[in-house]
Design a protein with these regions (language model features):
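N-terminal core-binding DNA-recognition domain of tyrosine site-specific recombinases/integrases
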Residues: 1-40, 56, 174-179, 194-197
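Basic, Lys/Arg- and aromatic-enriched nucleic-acid-binding interface segment
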Residues: 14-18, 22-24, 37, 41-43, ...
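Proline-centered turn/helix-capping motifs that create local helix->coil transitions or kinks
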Residues: 35-45, 108, 117-124, 156-164, ...
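Catalytic-site neighborhood detector that most strongly recognizes the C-terminal catalytic loop/helix
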Residues: 53, 57, 61, 119-121, ...
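C-terminal secondary-structure termini that scaffold catalytic or DNA-interacting sites
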Residues: 110, 121-142, 146-151, 157, ...
Length: 259
């Protein structure tokens, strides 16, 4: 394991990331479990392998003024596909989930959308480059998200004009993930907003939700996290800002009465 961490990358000779090492460990453990079940080996002890700790990625999100700038441009623009950017800001959808979303996944009567699949780029069974739509890898990623009434209204107007089965589309066809990412990058450049990845929209939703007082468990379910602890670790900075605000409110309310 130490060798993998220090020099396991066959291309560069450098170490592998903790996530990559943990993936290898999982394959080893599953293989040995099967061997033990089949009687090929007498003892299974792979659970004792110490996994390297993964570092939580730094969360980057848009400021409130940047968010408002993006929203105004997306809603005022002629490109209807840009509405997807606003949808992500108010639902926390991943880009693959957004681009796999079909109109049948939006229940206008109940005001909810169902996340049941995701789009990504890869190779098909013939080894050719393709847009692949698959079910989520985890049960928690399959979820229903209540929509703010403002977003529901925008989606209703879009549906009247849409000729596609997909919510976000180019005419009748679906949009490739990379193509949509590039459109987003161009929009940021046009608005003179510092570059951030598309995933920053998801982080922005989570940050604003916490600022509004949403509890971590509810946010975790909306984001499709398997464990609220993941949400807690990832957005601990946002929670600290919220705690500071609450503590200042307590001070402002009661300290002056004690003087």
């Amino acid at each position: 394991i130490t060798e993998l961490i220090e020099s396991g990358n066959m291309k560069t000779g450098k170490g592998l990331a903790a996530n990559s090492v943990n993936g290898i460990i999982t394959v080893i453990q599953n293989s040995l479990k099967l061997a033990y079940a089949l009687g090929t080996i007498k003892e299974y002890a792979a659970d004792k392998i110490r996994r390297p700790k993964t570092k939580e990625k730094e969360v980057t999100c848009f400021t409130l003024s940047e968010q408002k700038k993006i929203e105004r441009a997306a809603l005022a623009g002629k490109k209807t596909k840009w509405l997807g950017i606003v949808v992500c800001l108010y639902t926390g959808l991943r880009i693959g989930e957004l681009l796999a979303l079909e109109w049948k996944d939006v229940d206008f009567q109940k005001g909810v959308l169902t996340v049941s699949k995701s789009r990504h780029e890869g190779k098909d069974e013939n080894g050719r480059y393709a847009q692949i739509v698959e079910s989520p890898k985890t049960v928690s990623s399959r979820r229903c998200i209540p929509l703010p009434k403002q977003i529901l209204c925008e989606l209703r107007m879009l549906k009247r004009k849409s000729r596609s089965v997909y919510v976000i589309s180019n005419g009748e066809s679906s949009i490739p993930v990379r193509s949509y990412q590039r459109s987003f990058e161009r929009l940021l450049k046009k608005l003179d907003i510092p570059h951030k990845g598309f995933h920053a929209l998801r982080h922005t939703f989570a940050t604003r939700a916490l600022e509004c007082g949403m509890d971590v468990k509810m946010l975790s379910e909306l984001l499709g996290h398997k464990d609220p602890a993941v949400t807690l670790r990832r957005y601990v900075h946002s929670l600290m800002e919220q705690k500071k605000e609450m503590m200042n409110k307590v001070g402002n309310t009661y300290f002056k009465e004690a003087k």
